[in-house]
Swiss-Prot record:
Keywords associated with the record: Aminoacyl-tRNA synthetase, ATP-binding, Cytoplasm, Ligase, Magnesium, Metal-binding, Nucleotide-binding, Protein biosynthesis
Single GO cellular component term: cytoplasm
Organism: Leuconostoc citreum (strain KM20)
Gene: pheS
Binding site for Mg(2+): E261
Location in the cell: Cytoplasm
Catalytic EC class: ligase
Entry-linked Pfam families: Phe_tRNA-synt_N, tRNA-synt_2d
Keyword Metal-binding: yes
Stated family: Belongs to the class-II aminoacyl-tRNA synthetase family. Phe-tRNA synthetase alpha subunit type 1 subfamily.
This protein's name: Phenylalanine--tRNA ligase alpha subunit
Length: 349
């Protein structure tokens, strides 16, 4: 049999073997096309072919190689497709089933209260000042005390134990200094100043159920012409009803703060007030301090108290959260116990 006939015979048998094989395609490729494969062995006989037949034999040899290579590639692709389909069938996923639930975070309960306060005052036209430039937590004695009508020898300084860093630098005990910094920059030709300043403050208190060395405060202030105590009362009533409900009322009691005159303590009704309720049936709880800004405070900030008047107030988000949710220990807010904090879901409250 001539080499041409041998090549044609190999092509026919190779096609049949490839189509019928269930074995490893790679092993079949090696047996046909490898260095010791059947086609390679036949083509070694090219040296014995007459020169005039070598071209024809070479073309037939290339055709056999190409045919085998193409069929092997198709067979391999078909096997891979079949294997993938089998795998997909075995790993069928019902896309209608719910996915794995992911735990979703939420703002801390104190941040929720602060956000609620901020949104309310934004609706009243107030600006929020809480940046590090105008609301630093490390403050000077001048802004924290002296600008608030508390000179170095003032007895009211004993009311606040302070974390001093140096004799003139301290951790602020209140957010009131933000008022002074805001007044220094405000252009009253554009209208009155209406601002709140939320932030952390620090006192040298012993931590217990109602005290913390660090807590939150929201200072508020309105400065303009003809600002009265009635404006203060209306403002405070609106935020108390926002936090506790529209049927709650407030009352003001005379008090003393160095930076306001007159000064008041503000109580909110613990129970809802109805028109037919007797005064003695209303339960009151103290929630904040406020008053008309002292003329000395305005003067130290470059404001003429003969032309402008102002009111100021200080809200305690920590205390509001305790009252609103019936929490009896302020330390619970700072222990990072997710079991406790997860109760205060913003959507659910």
């Amino acid at each position: 049999m001539s080499l041409i006939e041998d090549l044609k015979a190999l092509k026919a048998t190779a096609v049949a073997r490839i189509n019928a094989t269930e074995a490893d395609v790679e092993a079949l490729r090696v047996s046909l096309l490898g260095k010791k494969g059947e086609l390679t062995a036949l083509l070694k006989g090219m040296k014995d072919v007459a020169p005039e037949e070598r071209k024809t034999v070479g073309e037939i040899g290339n055709d056999v190689r190409q045919t085998i290579t193409t069929l092997l590639a198709q067979k391999k692709a078909a096997e891979e497709t079949a294997r993938l389909n089998e795998q997909l069938a075995a790993e069928t996923i019902d896309v209608t089933l719910p996915g794995s639930a992911h735990q979703v975070g939420q703002p801390h309960v104190l941040q929720q209260i602060i956000d609620e306060i901020e949104q309310h005052f934004l609706g009243l036209g107030f600006e929020i000042i809480d940046d590090i430039v105008d609301s630093p937590e490390v403050e000077t004695d001048e802004y924290n005390f002296e600008r608030e009508n508390l000179p170095k020898d003032h007895p009211a300084r004993d009311m606040q134990d302070t974390f001093y860093i140096t004799p003139e630098i301290l951790l602020r005990t209140q957010t009131s200094p933000v008022q002074s910094r805001s007044l220094e920059k405000h252009d009253f030709s554009k209208g009155p100043l209406k601002m709140i300043a939320p932030g952390k403050v620090y006192r040298r208190d012993t931590d217990d159920a109602t005290h913390s060395h660090q807590f939150h405060q929201v200072e508020g202030m309105v400065v303009g012409e003809n600002i009265t105590m009635a404006d203060l009362k209306g403002t405070l009533l609106s935020i108390m009803q926002k936090l506790f409900g529209e049927k709650h009322q407030i009352r003001m009691r005379p008090s003393y703060f160095p930076f306001t005159e007159p000064s008041v303590e503000v109580d909110v009704s613990w129970n809802e007030v109805t028109p037919d309720m007797k005064p003695e049936d209303i339960e009151w709880i103290e929630v904040l301090g406020a008053g008309m800004t002292h003329p000395n405070v305005l003067r130290m900030d470059g404001i003429d108290p003969e032309k402008y008047s102002a009111f100021a107030f200080g809200l305690g988000p920590d205390r509001f959260a305790m009252l609103k949710y019936g929490v009896d220990d302020i330390r619970q807010f700072y222990l990072n116990d997710v079991r406790f904090l997860s109760q205060f879901n913003r959507k659910g409250n």
